[in-house]
Amino acid sequence: SRVFNYGKHEVIHFLLSNIKYWQEEFHFDGFRFDGVTSMIYRNHGLGENFTGYDKYFSLNTDVEAVTYLQLATELIHAINPFAVAIAEDMSGMPGMCLPIRYGGIGFDYRLGMGVPDFWIRMIKSTNCSHWNLYEMWHELTTRRPQEKVIGYCESHDQALVGDKTIIFRLADSEMYTGMDRAYHSPVIDRAIALHKMIRFVTLALACDGYLNFMGNEFGHPEWIDFPREGNGYSFHYARRQWSLADNGYLKYSQLLAFDTAMLKFARKYRVMCKRDAENLWIDPNAAVLAFSKGGLIYVFNFHDTNDARDFTLPVHTVGSGTYDVIFTSDERAFGGFG
């Protein structure tokens, strides 16, 4: 794709006036900057492995583009101090979400782009019982201090034409025949369970924000495809079918009920305000991951056949006495087995 020449004053004036226009005329209070990686590197970050700081700060860095982004975030917050600026940057540029006065670029949040890529890779490559839980923990918890990250399971990169949503990868063709509430099969039951667990563990280990994407909160089955020459300019897939979740006879409503309860849980226990996640137990053979955060114990069983009854878990210094189950993905109201 073509990029702007950020070294020209006329270009900078045009882009900044565009931001101001949307804020003042339409009262926009949030901006997501797409393709930031392509902007800030002269090679657009293509084929680059960002494994060291020399990859971030070199002659390949487009200083003029970085300066424009600093001006843009400064302007956004000058017009509305409560406005939010989010960067989509797959390179992990240091300082992206630090204030400009500290040498940063000034964004409020960055998207945790490695997380959805991790989930798709795991789903495509191996059975859930053999997922690498150590890698899962690393992907969901590794972030720079003082930089706010938005956790999410999937976005347009997964849901657009040419790829599949998480639920479609899990259930495949049975999405079209097996979503009646009265129907059960190993494929559908496993897909429903994993879809809930993937969302919950991603939210639980997010520290700054959590993002739902256009229907993944109820497991929308199909991709998004905007009208174009290749599809005869059809609007057929340029939609999200909320009627699926509103229909009380389908499992989509159970997935949505889970999402609603999960978000209420996150608000009640201030999950996004806690930064003290501690890995308590990883058992690769049993496919069990357990951790503490904010005084709560989270236990996830990713094994597709072992229900891990009478499982003993060392909780260390989190607390003493008895523990109560305050939230479970296996409730019947959520499509579980109780």
Give residue spans per PLM region:
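Alpha-helical packing segments of well-folded alpha/beta enzyme cores
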Residues: 11-22, 68, 72, 194-201, ...
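Acidic glycine-/aspartate-rich tracts in secreted/extracellular proteins
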Residues: 330-331
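Short acidic-aromatic active-site loops that bind/stabilize oxyanions
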Residues: 4-8, 188, 248-252
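Substrate-binding/active-site clefts of carbohydrate-active enzymes
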Residues: 1-61
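Catalytic cores of secreted or luminal carbohydrate-active enzymes
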Residues: 237, 241-271
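Conserved alpha/beta catalytic core and glycan-binding cleft of carbohydrate-active enzymes
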Residues: 27-29, 44-229, 235, 267-278, ...
